Amino acid sequence: AAVAQAIADQYSPKGPSDNCPSSPVSMALALAEKIDILVGFFGINEKPTGSKDPFALRRASLGIIRLVIENNIRIDLSVVINYSVSTYMNFNKKKLNVDDLLNFFWNRLKIYAKDKNISHDIIGAEFSWDFVKLLTKANSLQNFVYTDDGKNLLAGYKRATNILHAE
């Protein structure tokens, strides 16, 4: 029954309003399927460009981000992607720039964070391929910035920066 449910859920989430799978088998299959699609298409240099995304790679990457965050899965995405690349035995690795794929994910994460009302600057202040850890820290930092102490810290930093630029 778990395998049948996982097969039914493997393409979820299909969009921002679709539910993420929550059973371990379903999550594993959905993550594996999406990572394989991204690595495979980036491996043959089929990347989204501008408004063109015929293979729904943006949706797949946002699906991975949502699966990881909404199910509190603590994984290092860069390790998972590098492992996936290594499983392609006859794969022309020269065509696949892993950094391009990781940057693609980073940009998708910034869009996800923006949709969750997390400032771009806050996301940029902390870097981690563990998205759960990253968003937890970003939320904490964003909450702090809006307190009186946070505003005072930013004002002091701005003053110090202006003094240094003036000299």
Label each region the model flagged.
Residues 1-167:
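Amphipathic alpha-helical "coupling" segments that flank catalytic cores
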